[in-house]
């Protein structure tokens, strides 16, 4: 009986201890790509994910191929957010930069908090969003709360 009482005490401590999420608000930079922190974070039920691409990626009429994916902690694909400017899923999309500012073109994606092609809502927890630009990957974490 003592063994179970000890396990119960540990479970109570783990479940009742508040979780603090500390995340740098500076964008993750990878040369020509900046992936910003989603906002709000933590969120429920939806969030916006900002990112910036250097105008160098668009020189001479080039169009970078961009994907944005959201994974759970088991590395399962949860969703592909939509580009806010067009509503198009960000899955191998060639982007245009019509109005660069300060050497960068700004974009944002929207995730409604649902699993891809489903009405099932994402559970509370940590998720990783990964931006892929011409094969270059940049990732950040976000938190869903219910």
Model segments located where?
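Terminal processing/anchoring signals of secreted or surface-associated proteins
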Residues: 38-41, 51, 75, 111, ...
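Short, surface-exposed loop/turn motifs with a glycine/proline- and acidic-biased composition
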Residues: 87-134
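C-terminal tail/sorting-segment detector
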Residues: 22-26, 35-36, 120, 124-146
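Glycine-centered coil/turn sites that cap beta-strands in beta-rich domains
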Residues: 25-39, 43-69, 83
